[in-house]
Swiss-Prot record:
The keyword Repeat applies. The keyword Membrane applies. Gene3D superfamilies: Leucine-rich Repeat Variant (1.25.10.10). Changing T374M: In PEBAT; severely decreased interaction with beta tubulin; does not affect localization to centrosome. This is Tubulin-specific chaperone D. Found in a complex with at least ARL2, PPP2CB, PPP2R1A, PPP2R2A, PPP2R5E and TBCD. Interacts with PPP2CB. Part of a supercomplex made of cofactors A to E. Cofactors A and D function by capturing and stabilizing tubulin in a quasi-native conformation. Cofactor E binds to the cofactor D-tubulin complex; interaction with cofactor C then causes the release of tubulin polypeptides that are committed to the native state. Interacts with ARL2; interaction is enhanced with the GDP-bound form of ARL2. Does not interact with ARL3, ARL4A and ARL4D. Interacts with beta tubulin. Interacts with TBCE. It is linked to Encephalopathy, progressive, early-onset, with brain atrophy and thin corpus callosum: An autosomal recessive disease with neurodevelopmental and neurodegenerative features. PEBAT is characterized by early-onset cortical atrophy, hypomyelination, microcephaly, thin corpus callosum, delayed psychomotor development, developmental regression, intellectual disability, seizures, optic atrophy, muscle weakness and atrophy, spastic quadriplegia, and respiratory insufficiency due to hypotonia. Changing T994M: In PEBAT; uncertain significance. Tubulin-folding protein implicated in the first step of the tubulin folding pathway and required for tubulin complex assembly. Involved in the regulation of microtubule polymerization or depolymerization, it modulates microtubule dynamics by capturing GTP-bound beta-tubulin (TUBB). Its ability to interact with beta tubulin is regulated via its interaction with ARL2. Acts as a GTPase-activating protein (GAP) for ARL2. Induces microtubule disruption in absence of ARL2. Increases degradation of beta tubulin, when overexpressed in polarized cells. Induction: Down-regulated by shear stress. It comes from Homo sapiens (Human). It comes from the Eukaryota.
Length: 1192
């Protein structure tokens, strides 16, 4: 085994962290057994080659990583895998690179299965000791490429240390020559272990395992344990956790000491325990920033504490059942359902002295419970549980009391979390006696709802999760009669956590704890019914929990009031606005389960909270008041009673005064004013829907003022909450108008109608875009009786909002909301013959269509990107809604040319480049096509369209995926009516920036053109449409630049080769003229580069077109931008080599030489001379300098 050769290349293990949704393993066996055997069999062939070696290593790593969650499936295969790899290691002829590779594979297996399981498979005969020791000795600790080799060899050596023979028997004669003695095996192993305890790689962990196995041997502990412990304590004393080397040294030493005090016999370790504890105190590890050092310190402290105490099972502990399954079954056959817990009043060891070091150990463990890192707290909690199990009952009870002290609101969330973990450990081990359950359950119930706001986030998720773990542990630890007094409180708390907790992990933990209690205790009310609804997966969706599952559980009377109380007490004032809104909506649902309780107990509390100085409490309570009032109205309405039958006069007056109280206290101003406005708008909406007896009251004027003021000042509201505020105000206005502004059935109060319509129409001309948005939607939300007689005036105002003018070209959002308002008004007033001021009819439908179709060409862009998308999307939706409305009522109002324009515009949008927008357009297109109640009249090419887009394919096609959308949409190019618009959309997609969009749109277009190559008429029609698009969009860079790129693609691909057989083909002549106009005087680099490519491709057309194309290229060779000159020269060079017939063979070499040898980014005077020379060679006239106007 030539391990002293150069190490093979390799890197440390790769740990990929997947941040997406993780899928649990569901494997049944090691399915890659044959592949793995073949992979290991090829190691001798691939170890030398870099690429093959890395591929084999990576493939093996991928295979093994699949079993990271189910490593036990590897157990039947571990032995043959290890044998194959160790055969390589033990083969004397194996080169060093192959041996290192074998150890890398061994390490990967160890990483997945764990070294403890893997260790027993290593050969551990007496004959293996020296060869393994020799292998370790020749390793280079500084070789960073072979750390896996050292790690595995140290583990192997730790196994060989377990041989039941004295190591001195292996030494033989230590005197090799007179005066020279070689080291004994015992000394060599100890030296190696000590040297690797202070290295910086993974071998340090293996060295700690080696030390623990070696030092605790009977023949080694007598002579080496004291020496090693002295060396270790000196290392700890000299090292500082403030330096990197100090951290490494302390880490290795602490690991070794912790392992020794774990595996060593108590009588061997006890003499040194106090000394080690004193040294550990001096290290001040709790002050270190290194989590691992603090964790190892806690681990070592608890092992020292366990060394101080005799290993015994506390006779006073609480026991449920028996460890023996046979004993438990025997109890059942005797008719006993439970075993009484055994509590001795006298403990045989009660009088034993507890060593003084125990108190210091427990003190340090209690400090560890409050550590800032979870791993340290968890280790301390387990230490508390282990120590308490060996203490007398009185002292263990003191420990429990100290743990309960962690649950003070002066303590941090870290202390609460550590306390929960410790209680769970104590309960799980039967060390929490039933007499303590009253105190423990009280703090656990608090921990289940622990949630503290800290800055911009909250803390407490881990506390609530650990509290669920405590409940889970108690279910397994105690008999049902012990927990019976607490069943109601625990079950309600767990249900509340499972349904109303903000964090998904806590909801799932609570659900699991509830399930454990139902299964093991059997005393939770309606446990099985609740579990089937609130299972692990169901509680994953927060909205579903708050709004659906909560209603089901509240149907059981034991849980109804606790759930409502929790929402009012904790969630209505929660720091997260989403939780407050969900809590209010949940109260709406639960109020219908307990109307009397909600009206008499909950509602007064909520009303008192609306005046709280706390912003979150005010916001949540106002929302809750609105929702509960509306819920009570629904109940009353079912019996044709008013809501006042549930709410007394004091409650009604309290609701009415909320707005005025907030206004008087100026709480509508500032940052908090946003929340207050939104909440009161919801209140207005719900109270209006609840038909509160406020008609004619001054509060209506106050509500109207708030709605108007909110809509007028939307631009002052933060952008992230603006949409929610706008929606709330508009919804409030709609409900308010419907309930309080109707004078007679179907008739509006004329004064109010005049004031509202006039004021809102005036605001549509406001210079603030957001104000226009708000009042546009407000007009759209007005009920029909307020629009009666003023419809034409309102539509005219909204059409003006949708019109793009130079002053408001960037107001895309106001145009979008104006379109939405028009569509909503049409739905409100309906379609019927009559005056245009009453409903949609023949006199105004064309004007509405004109406004909607005009917005289909809105391609406004600003710093936010293509904001015109919002307008076009709203226009398509509005067109669909209006057309379907007309088709249902009066299809004769849909004119043929209007329907054609709608379908063509929507088809164009369905072929453009933005994925989600293309999907929406396709949805609209197919909805219009397949609508059959009745069918929409005048759809162009309906028969062909239904064949191209059958109803059966609608659900299966993902139009947002370019690979599925473009092959289908390009089929419309064969229909003359749609060709222009679809080709226009495709051009924009094909010349875009997204790789997948470009690829699939290009492929689809080429497939279509390939199909029409044999049809001159179809090809001519297509080329004419392409030129028409170019002509219509000349100097429109949104279209012209992508069009030039498209032309480059189709010309390069030979789509128009049929035209090259004719000199000066009309297509080529017109295309050349349009390209010249497009790039003339342009400074757009992208446009010029695309133009160069097109001119180069046009030299394939014979005749004057070729000469003119070459002339344009020669002009570009002297362009003012050096980049353009260089690119032109490069592309002309390639073109002349591609189309060899363009230049005569006698001058081709000279032309190519000039193009390649000239520095085209040099001064123009130099470049111009070479350009003129090229003109002469190519046979085109030399360009002449045109004097600038006014030049002297």
């Amino acid at each position: 085994m030539a391990l002293s050769d150069e190490p093979a290349a390799g890197g440390p293990e790769e740990e990929a962290e997947d941040e997406t949704l993780a899928f649990g393993a569901a494997l049944e066996a090691f399915g890659e057994s044959a592949e793995t055997r073949a992979l290991l069999g090829r190691l001798r062939e691939v170890h030398g080659g870099g690429a093959e070696r890395e591929v084999a290593l990576e493939r093996f790593r991928v295979i093994m990583d699949k079993y990271q969650e189910q490593p036990h499936l590897l157990d039947p295969h571990l032995e043959w895998m290890m044998n194959l790899l160790l055969d390589i290691v033990q083969d004397q002829t194996s080169p060093a690179s192959l041996v290192h590779l074998a150890f890398k594979f061994l390490y990967i297996i160890t990483k997945v299965r764990g070294y403890k399981t893997f260790l027993r498979l290593f050969p551990h005969e007496v004959a293996d000791v020296e060869p393994v020791l020799d292998l370790v000795t020749i390793q280079n600790p500084k070789d960073h490429e072979a750390w896996e080799t050292r790690y595995m060899l140290l583990l192997w050596l730790s196994v060989t240390c377990l041989i039941p023979f004295d190591f001195s028997r292996l030494d033989g004669n230590l005197l090799t020559q007179p005066g020279q003695a070689r080291m004994s095996i015992m000394d060599r192993i100890l030296q190696i272990a000590e040297s690797y305890l202070i290295v910086s790689d993974k071998a340090r962990d293996a060295a700690a395992v080696l030390v623990s196995r070696f030092i605790t041997r009977p023949d080694v502990k007598q002579s080496k344990m004291a020496e090693f412990l002295d060396w270790s304590l000196c290392n700890l004393a000299r090292s500082s956790f403030q330096t990197m080397q100090g951290v490494i040294t302390m880490d290795g030493t602490l690991q070794a000491l912790a392992q020794i005090f774990k595996h060593g016999k108590r009588e061997d370790c006890l003499p040194y325990a106090a000394t080690v504890l004193r040294c550990l105190d001096g290290c001040r590890l709790p002050e270190s920033n290194q989590t691992l050092l603090r964790k190892l310190g806690v681990k070592l402290v608890q092992r020292l504490g366990l060394t101080f105490l005799k290993p015994k099972v506390a006779a006073w502990r609480y026991q449920r059942g028996c460890r023996s399954l046979a004993a438990n079954l025997q109890l059942l056959t005797q008719g006993q359902s439970e075993q009484k817990p055994l509590i001795l009043t006298e403990d045989d060891d009660e009088d034993d002295d507890v060593p003084e070091g125990v108190e210091r150990v427990i003190e340090q463990l209690l400090v560890g419970l409050k550590d800032k890192d979870t791993v340290v707290r968890w280790s301390a909690a387990k230490g508390i549980g282990r120590m308490a199990g060996r203490l007398p009952r009185a002292l263990a009870d003191d420990v429990v009391g100290s743990v309960l002290d962690c649950f003070s609101f002066q303590e941090t969330d870290k202390a609460w979390h550590g306390g929960c973990l410790a209680l769970a450990e104590l309960g799980r081990r039967g060390l929490l006696l039933p007499s303590r359950l009253v105190d423990v359950v009280a703090v656990i119930l608090k921990a289940l709802t622990y949630d503290e706001k800290r800055g911009a986030c909250s803390v407490g998720t881990n506390v609530r999760d650990a509290a669920c773990y405590v409940c889970w542990a108690f279910a397994r630890a105690y008999e049902p009669q012990e927990l019976k007094p607490f069943v109601t409180a625990i079950s309600s708390a767990l249900v509340i956590a499972a349904v109303f907790d903000r964090d998904i992990n806590c909801r799932r933990a609570a659900s699991a704890a509830f399930q454990e209690n139902v299964g093991r205790q059997g005393t939770f009310p309606h446990g099985i019914d609740i579990l089937t609804t609130a299972d692990y997966f169901a509680v994953g969706n927060r909205s579903n929990c708050f709004l659906v599952i909560s209603v089901f559980i509240a149907g059981f009377p034991e849980y109804t009031q606790p759930m409502i109380d929790h929402l009012v007490t904790m969630k209505i004032s929660h720091w997260d606005g989403v939780i407050r809104e969900l809590a209010a909506r949940a109260l709406h649902n639960l109020a219908q389960q307990a109307p009397e309780f909600s009206a008499t107990q909950v509602f007064p509390r909520l009303l008192s909270m609306t005046l709280s100085p706390d912003l979150h409490m005010r916001h949540g309570s106002i929302l809750a008041c609105a929702e509960v009032a509306y819920a009570l109205y629904k109940l009353a309405a079912q019996e044709n009673r008013p809501v006042t039958d549930h709410l007394d006069e004091q409650a009604v007056q309290g609701l009415k005064q909320i707005h005025q109280q907030l206004y008087d206290r100026q709480l509508y101003r500032g940052l908090g004013g946003q929340l207050m406005r939104q909440a009161v708008c919801v209140l207005i909406e719900k109270l209006s829907l609840s038909k509160m007896p406020f008609r004619g009251d001054t509060v209506i004027d106050g509500w109207q003022w708030l709605i108007n003021d909110t809509l007028r000042h939307l631009h002052l509201i933060s952008s992230h909450s603006r949409q929610q505020m706008k929606d709330a105000a508009v919804s409030a206005l709609a409900a308010l108008c419907s309930e309080y502004y109707m004078k007679e059935p179907g008739e509006a109060d004329p004064a109010i109608q005049e004031e509202l319509i006039t004021q809102y129409l005036a605001e549509l001309r406001n210079p603030e875009e957001m104000t226009r948005c708000g009042f546009s939607l407000a007009l759209g939300a007005l009920p029909g009786f307020l629009l009666k007689g003023r419809l034409q005036q309102v539509l005219t105002g909204l059409r003006a909002v949708t019109h793009t003018s130079p002053e408001d070209v960037s107001f895309a959002e106001s145009r979008r909301d104006g379109l939405k308002a028009i569509a909503r008004i049409c739905q409100t007033v309906g379609v019927k013959a009559g005056a245009p001021d009453e409903a949609v009819c023949g006199e105004n439908v064309s004007q509405i269509y004109c406004a909607l179709l005009g917005c289909m060409d809105d391609y406004t862009t600003d710093s936010r990107g293509d904001v015109g998308t919002w307008v076009r999307k709203a226009a398509m939706t509005s067109l669909m809604d209006l057309t379907l409305l007309l088709a249902r009522s009066q299809p004769e109002l849909i004119e043929a040319h209007t329907c054609e324009r709608i379908m063509c515009c929507v088809a164009q949008q369905a072929s453009e480049k933005i994925d989600r927008f293309r999907a929406h357009a396709a949805s609209v297109f197919l909805t219009l096509l397949h609508f059959d109640s009745p069918p929409i009249p005048h759809v162009p090419h309906r028969g062909e369209l239904e064949k191209l887009f059958p109803r059966s394919d609608v659900a299966s096609v993902n139009w947002s995926a370019p690979s599925q959308a473009f092959p289908r949409i390009t089929q419309l190019l064969g229909l003359p009516t749609y060709r222009y618009h679809v080709l226009l959309g495709l051009v924009v997609s094909l010349g875009g920036l997204t790789e997948s969009t470009i690829r699939h749109s290009t492929q689809s277009l080429f497939e279509y053109m390939k199909g029409i190559q044999s049809d001159p008429q179809a090809l001519g029609s297509f080329s004419g449409t392409l030129l028409q698009i170019f002509e219509d969009n000349l100097l429109n860079e949104r279209v012209s630049v992508p069009l030039l790129k498209t032309l480059d693609h189709v010309l390069t691909h030979g789509c128009f080769d049929i035209f090259t057989t004719e000199e000066d083909h009309p297509f080529a002549v017109k295309l050349l003229a349009l390209c010249k106009k497009e790039i003339k005087n342009s400074k757009d680099i992208q446009k010029l580069l695309s133009g160069i490519a097109v001119f180069c491709e046009m030299v394939q057309f014979p005749g004057d077109v070729r000469r003119q194309a070459l002339l344009q290229l020669c002009l570009l060779l002297c362009h003012r931008f050096p980049l353009i000159r260089k690119t032109t020269a490069s592309q002309v060079y390639e073109t002349l080599l591609t189309y060899s017939d363009v230049v005569g063979a006698d001058v081709l070499d000279e032309v190519v030489t000039v193009l390649s040898d000239t520095a085209w980014d040099a001064e123009l005077a130099v470049v111009r001379e070479q350009r003129n020379r090229l003109c002469d060679l190519l046979g085109v006239p030399r360009p002449q300098l045109v004097p600038q106007p006014g030049a002297c």
